[in-house]
UniProtKB/Swiss-Prot annotation:
Keywords of the record: Elongation factor, Protein biosynthesis
Quaternary data: EF-1 is composed of four subunits: alpha, beta, delta, and gamma.
Source organism superkingdom: Eukaryota
Domain GST N-terminal stretches: 2-87
Species, as recorded: Danio rerio
Cellular component aspect of the GO annotation: cytoplasm; nucleus
Positions of the EF-1-gamma C-terminal domain: 281-442
Protein name: Elongation factor 1-gamma
Job of this protein: Probably plays a role in anchoring the complex to other cellular components.
One GO MF term: translation elongation factor activity
PANTHER family according to UniProt: ELONGATION FACTOR 1-GAMMA
One record GO biological process: translational elongation
């Protein structure tokens, strides 16, 4: 039976998966989430920790026998028993299916909707409304599946239930008020059944369902942002004033440091977004000359204003042909695509693995067709004149599964493709299948 230590920060929902799995399997698990055993931002930056867990991320697991694991799903899987993992090849595959579903379909919209209500992310109305629609779609899929089932896989709780429940936890606690969750009674019945099991309650405590949808709090968001240091004012006056200035400045700096520390603690405790504080790596695009095209400004136009009348004209008016390039990508293996939601997993999974590329890229990737008859293609905008993926080993996992063709930005073909893919509407003559759904990388 597994025995070891789980390193995490308090209230990390990703760590809950491993903790609940251990409750079911009987694995002996020590939790290191507070000093002196673990201090987030210090312990996970130490040479000893990085020697076992090179990314410095938590949760991280170290067995009493020295066996080490990172990534929450891998840890939860290791700490599970055969019943949780699926006792047949079919059941095991279904468990993996729902674990992937949670990562690619639940977490992105849940984060986009919930994080602003916690004050750790700026509110964007269009992004929030889109996230709500995606959450509705996810809940509808679950509701239909659970219509004739008690649990997601088989007749007993599995790692599928544990993972999806933990992914939905903040939604149910923060924003899924009674009116919103009313159309999905099967999901709520299943969720409540799970969180009231002794093994769940030991880890989660009493889970209170949301009564009123939490909203973005601008004041709370402002309080959680790092404070900008005020410029030092020069003292006027005699020698006595000059002597006092260094002491006064030292006190001010200490106070500023204390104020800065508080938001980081709150953010760390509330959400996995604290993991954003990773060591800065060298910018892969540092060798390129500065461009006049401000990608972030275009993304704001695209997110907040009409695509056809505002965002697209802005794009072409400001696009830097020397500093950026436009590419058409097409998935190489359409014959392997089956269920639509699983095909979308390929897109969202790729987006997640390219997270650090977002500052220098934009893409609209679309799934066309229906179940067992679909294809994937998209338009990508990259900093520079070459594909960005070779610039970092972290970006090379998925791109070889696509064919890439650089477009002539002055051609009618390019303008038509950009228009259709950015707007998610048009004839898409080169595809030959109807639009199913799209994903935006920004």
């Amino acid at each position: 039976m597994a025995a070891g230590t789980l390193y995490t920060y308090p209230e990390n929902w990703r760590a809950f998966k491993a903790q609940i799995a251990a409750q079911y399997s009987g694995a002996r698990l020590k939790i290191a989430s507070a000093p002196p055993a673990f201090t987030f931002g210090q312990t996970n930056r130490s040479p000893a920790f990085l020697g076992n867990f090179p990314l410095g991320k938590v949760p991280a697991y170290q067995g009493d026998d020295g066996f080490c694991l990172f990534e929450s799903n891998a840890i939860a899987h290791y700490l599970s028993n055969d019943v949780l993992r699926g006792s047949t090849p079919q059941a095991s595959a279904q468990v993996l299916q729902w674990v992937s579903f949670a990562d690619s379909e639940v977490i992105p919209p849940a984060s986009a909707w919930v994080f602003p209500t916690l004050g750790i992310m700026q509110f964007n109305k269009q992004a929030t409304e889109q996230a709500k629609e995606e959450v509705k779609r996810v809940l509808a899929v679950l509701n239909q599946h659970l219509n004739t089932r008690t649990f997601l896989v088989g007749e007993r709780i599995s790692l599928a239930d544990i993972t999806v429940v933990c992914s939905l936890l903040w939604l149910y606690k923060q924003v899924l008020e009674p009116a919103f969750r009313q159309p999905y009674p099967n999901v709520t019945r299943w969720f409540v059944t799970c969180v009231n099991q002794p093994q769940f309650k030991t880890v989660l405590g009493e889970v209170k369902l949301c009564e009123k949808m939490a909203q973005f709090d601008a004041k709370k968001f402002a309080e959680m942002q790092p404070k900008k240091e005020a410029p030092i004012k020069k003292e006027k006056g005699g020698k006595e004033g000059g002597k006092q200035q260094p002491q006064q400045q030292e006190k001010k700096e200490k106070k500023k440091e204390e104020k800065k520390a508080a938001p980081a603690e709150e953010e760390m405790d509330e959400c996995e977004a604290a993991l954003a504080s990773e060591p800065k790596a060298k910018d892969p695009f540092a060798h390129l000359p500065k461009s006049s095209f401000v990608m972030d400004e275009f993304k704001r136009k695209y997110s907040n204003e009409d695509t056809m009348t505002v965002a697209l004209p802005y794009f072409w008016d400001h696009f830097d042909r020397e500093g950026f390039s436009i590419w058409y990508a097409e998935y190489r293996f359409p014959e392997e695509l089956t269920m639509a939601f699983m095909s979308c997993n390929l897109i969202t999974g790729m987006f997640q693995r390219l997270d650090k590329l977002r500052k220098n890229a934009f893409a609209s990737v679309i799934l066309f067709g229906a179940n067992n008859d679909s294809c994937i293609s998209g338009i990508w905008v990259f900093r520079g004149q070459d594909l960005a993926f070779p610039l970092s080993d972290d970006w090379q996992i998925d791109y070889e599964s696509y064919t890439w063709r650089k477009l002539d930005v002055d051609s009618e073909e390019c303008k038509t493709m950009v228009k259709e893919y950015f707007a998610w509407e048009g004839e898409f003559k080169h595809v030959g299948k109807p639009f199913n759904q799209g994903k935006i990388f920004k």
